[in-house]
Structures are given as structure tokens and as C-alpha cells.
Amino acid sequence: MKSTVEQLSPTRVRINVEVPFAELEPDFQRAYKELAKQVRLPGFRPGKAPAKLLEARFGREAMLDQVVTEALPARYGQAVAESEVHPLGQPEIEVTKKEYGQELAFTAEVDVRPELNLPDPGALKISVDPIEVTDEDVDAELQSLRARFGTLTGVERPVAEGDFVSIDLSATIDGQEVPGATAQGLSHEVGSGRLIEGLDEALIGMSVDESREFTTKLVSGEHAGQDAQVTVTVKSVKERELPEPDDEFAQLASEFDTIDELRANLREQVGRVKRAQQAERIRDAAIDTLLEQVDIPLPEAIVKAQVDSALHGALHSLNHDESKLEEVLAQQGKSREEFENETRTAAETDVKKQLLLDALADKLQVQVGQEDLTERLVATSRQYGIEPQQLLAYLQENNQLPAMFADVRRALAIAEVIRAATVTDTAGNTIDTSEFFGKRPSGDGAADEDADQADESTTADAGE
């Protein structure tokens, strides 16, 4: 078999393939063997009918068509491997020559990853906002911890912000009760905003057994997007009493003996969270900076597939009702055209990021180890509240492991870029990225820079 590649565009190629007829002989033998098992010819045991009789029975052209159809995927895969192209999506295959006893010829057009001119990661400069852990941040965490150990006590007064109430709810549209919109004895924290819009405002000032009506827009169900009249009745009111933030509370709520030790620990926890958030901003800034510097041609078929998938998902959530989608968009102040344009822009950005990170991973020769995959598997399973083995089984069952592998490889690639880049906050202070992106390999530019600074310091000390 021989193949050649034509570059149709930076993101699309045509692979021309020629397969000598002799190379199809094993395919013919397999086809005859399978067919012989399925048919019975007088005088022959099942599976023993000769090929010539099968050809006479079913026709040589029909056999050729079957062999070619079954042979194309493997021959296409072989051509891809030999040409070292990186296909994206499924090919469009056209058989250009198919005659018994002669070579098989076909073409395969497919989108491919474009060649990208990538900058030196060491020349990349990234700047993000600084982080600061304030006393107010610590107070908020302490307040949240106190709330977890608080007690609820019934009160005989109107509802106030922060109270816990038991309520009955019902909703109507044009006087007709909305199915599934009735609830009794529902617990709710006033001011949390966890239920329907307008409820918290209606509850403030209400007393036990008092009812009040308000109008809200339904966000789910068959009446999503419509205005409904909601009636709320207060059945009970409780306030939360918080423990005093003292040493006794610290011993109750933590492993620490004093409130000062507890506050110090909370400060460290807040710092970790803020550093993690800053790391995400660093990652996003690194990708955005690279996207600005690198020209990335887009494979149209891949972008279109992603747009179609997003549109399908939006309609699926609305039972594929186009009119409901129009209603939802109208409530958001968007036209269908604006929605589709936004969806396409998001798809283009997403595809560009994937192409960029894949190219970086190739250039940096990123290798994904078992430990990397296990770490991602454990983190993702924790996020969804399931066991890692459950997630692994789901990924295998739905053929999603390759996607996870690719995602981990991209994460490792951008981490390597960040390790090599110069990362500072907007005040000009260097940010240590090792906590989330790993340490720079010894002997790189950062180590050389540290050595230079040490030499300068030694020289200065010697001159004093």
C-alpha cells in the first residue's frame, strides 16, 4: 500500500491511498469464510462452501463491495500512521477506483491539527492581581464555623434576615395551579436566595400563620420563563444563636486550645483558597497571552461540530422546543442570531485552546504518567461525590478515558509553560508558582538567575 498527502489548507488534508489487489486477499478470505458460515449450499457442510460457488451465488461485485467497505477503516488508519498526520474528527472517504483484480484507490479528506509557531515559554511574562488575607476574611470564616455550631430557637416576632422559617408555598398562572409547584413545611434560611426569586423579600416582616402573595418568573418546568403568582405562608420562625468566639468554642470546633490558634489556622485556610484561585488566574492568563501571540487556524468542521453540540444541549434542556428557546433568549434580551454567534465564538476559543495546548505538549514532549491520571481521577471523583472506581468504570463504559488523558496532558503542558515563565503580581512582586505548578527543573534559567543574584550579593558583601 502506498499513500500521499495533499495539504488542502492549514487545517485540512487529502490522503490519497492505493492498495494493490494482492493485499486485499486476506480480506477476501475472511469475507468468504464469514459468508460460508451464514449460508447453506447443497452438498457442502456449513462453513465449507468454496469461494467460487459463493461468488456465483452472490456475485463478484457484491463480494468486492463488502470487502472494500470492511477494509477501508484499517487501510485509512494505516495511511494516517504512515503519513504522521494528526486527524481531528472523522474523514470523508471517497473510493476512486474499485475493480476486481486491480488496485483499490480511495481518498480521505480530514481536518488535522495545524502546525503552530510557538513562542519560547521562558520569554512569557504573566501578571495577575496580588492576594491578601484580611481580618475580615478570617472573621467571615469564623462566623461560618460558629453558624455550624449554632442552635435554632423559636421566636415570637416578625421574620428578619437570617431567620430560619418553615413555609408553605403554592403557585398559579392566570388562576390555574402550577403542577409540582406546591410544598408544605419547607425549611428556608431567609436571605440565602436558595429558593425562588422574590421569596426572601416577601418573607421579611411576616408573622406566623400570615400569608403573602408575590410575582416571580419560573425558571424550570413546562412553564419556565412565565410569570407566576406565588403564595407563601409562614408556619414557624426560628433564629440561630451562635456560640461565643472564645477558647471554649475553639476547643469545641477544632483541635486547637485557643481562639487565637483557631484564627491563625483559618487565616492559613483562606490563604490556601486564595492562592488556588490565583493559580487559576495565572493559568488563564498564560493561555490568554499565548492565544494573543500565536496564530491558530481553525478547522471549520470541528468548530461546527462543537457549535451543533452546544445548540443541541440547549434545546435538549427545553425538550427540543424551539419556541421555548426563543422565549428564554427573549428574557435574556438576546436574539437567536446573537445566541448562535456567542456559541460559535465560545466554540472557536475552546478549539483554539485545545490546539494550542496540544501543540505545546508535543513541543515540550509532555508524558502523562499513571500517577498523573490517578490524581485527576481521584480529584474528579471527589468533585462528584463518588468513588474513583465508579468514575473509572463510567469513563471506560462511555469511552471517555482518552478525553481525560488529553485533558491531563494539556494541564501538564501549561504547568510546564508557567514554570518557565516570569510570573508577577501587578505590584511587580514575583509569585512562587511551585505550590500548584511544581518546581522548575534544576539548572534552568531561574536557577541561573538565583545564582547570579547570589554572586552579586557576595560581591557586594566583599566590597563593604
From Swiss-Prot:
Region (Disordered): 431-464
Keyword Cytoplasm: yes
Skewed-composition ranges (Acidic residues): 446-455
Subcellular location: Cytoplasm
Main location: cytoplasm
Residues forming coiled coils: none
MF term (GO), any: peptidyl-prolyl cis-trans isomerase activity
GO CC, alphabetical: cytoplasm
Catalytic activity, as annotated: [protein]-peptidylproline (omega=180) = [protein]-peptidylproline (omega=0)
Keyword Isomerase: yes
Residue stretches making up the PPIase FKBP-type domain: 162-243
Family annotation (Pfam families): FKBP_C, Trigger_C, Trigger_N
Family the entry assigns: Belongs to the FKBP-type PPIase family. Tig subfamily.
The protein, known as: Trigger factor
Organism annotation: Mycolicibacterium paratuberculosis (strain ATCC BAA-968 / K-10)
Gene: tig
